[in-house]
Amino acid sequence: MITIKLIREVYNQNGVFGTMHIKDTELKKDIVIKTVERPQLPKGWEKLTPTQRMKYCIPTGQYPMKWKFDTDLDLRFIIRGISTWQIMHFTGSNLSTTNVIKVGTQATSDGNVKGGVQVLKELSEYIKELMLFGFIPITPQYKFFTLEIVNSPTYHEEEFGEDELEIFC
């Protein structure tokens, strides 16, 4: 089973406004992931409030955001922002059933994370496609994925129901 978790976006001194961690639950360590390309942020962006930053985090399709992950899993995908993050391409190999995949997504402008939930659903669909075309081996432990929302300041259980969504292949 692969668990995909939604976490809030992260800002740091380099201006990277998204993060993704792959947790190896057997080795008890995080695999370091690096971004190699991101949208151009304005000078002085670090002084902007989170609300002001959001308009730069949610572009209207003028440019894609490319992430390259320097990990043993060789994960690469392109994220394009419209009204929410949408995963447009995903490739992976050598995925382990012990890995927890956490995906950081930007909330929509009205402050909810429905878009993040949609991203996770789309990610699961891409994983299914990779299985279909043989990029990920179809084995019994890959029969379903658990999608879980965690650490979201705008998450409301009464609005979204259960905090785990099982996507069956």
Go through each PLM region and give its residues.
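Cell wall/extracellular polymer interaction/catalysis modules
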Residues: 1-169
